[in-house]
A protein has these predicted regions:
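Non-catalytic C-terminal interaction segments of nucleic acid-processing enzymes
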Residues: 3-19, 93-174
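Catalytic cores of nucleic-acid endonucleases
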Residues: 49, 55-104
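Anionic group-transfer/hydrolysis microenvironments
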Residues: 29, 42, 55
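A short, well-structured beta->alpha microelement
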Residues: 35-36, 58
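Active-site beta-strand-loop-beta-strand hairpin of nuclease catalytic cores
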Residues: 37-51
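Flexible, charged surface loops at secondary-structure boundaries
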Residues: 17-18, 44-46, 74-77
Length: 174
């Protein structure tokens, strides 16, 4: 049974988080960006951003090429950009310059082409794209603004919770 677009987006987001992009969003998050780009999955880590576009069909891949931020890559988000699909939909020969490819096989993401080594993510000379940092900033602002509107923004001052200890019961409490 074919994987749905929503499933690909969730797999891509989880994949980003497991690969060092601890702040990651999937396609259910919508935000205003200068050129209308809505990421299927995008992740951020110190010094780098990674965009993943989910494709369930070749026609979707071909339609993607007509978007203004694909025609002019400097308008798009992501220092690194990948397509994710099931095998047989996108081949390495289909990739635009600088793009990488991930395939989903038996529910697992496989690195097919272009996934860099750990040190390459932040090396400017290694990055295939100069991402539109204003669009990325607008995207992040939208996420933080929503947290502020819900009264959660002040939690950023609480620091990072590494290993939160389990609460202990005092003898006699249930």
């Amino acid at each position: 049974m074919a994987i749905t677009h929503d499933e690909l987006c969730l797999l891509a987001c989880n994949f980003l988080q497991k690969n060092g992009f601890k702040v990651a969003f999937h396609d259910r998050f919508r935000a205003w960006t200068p050129y209308g780009e809505q990421a299927d999955a995008i992740g951020f880590r110190n010094g780098a951003s990674c965009l993943i576009e989910a494709k369930c069909s070749r026609s979707d891949l071909l339609a993607d090429r007509k978007k203004p931020f694909r025609i002019e890559p400097e308008k798009g988000m992501g220092d690194w950009r990948f397509f994710i699909s099931e095998p047989g939909i996108i081949e390495i020969s289909d990739l635009p310059e600088g793009w990488g490819l991930l395939h989903v096989v038996k529910g697992r993401v496989k690195k097919v082409h272009g996934w860099p080594g750990n040190w390459e993510w932040v090396n400017r000379a290694s990055k295939p794209f100069s991402a539109n940092k204003q669009a990325e900033c607008d995207y992040m602002f939208s996420a933080l603004r929503r947290m502020d509107l819900r009264g959660h923004l002040k939690e950023v001052y609480d620091g990072v919770i590494i290993n939160k200890p389990e609460p202990t019961l005092i003898e006699g409490e249930e």
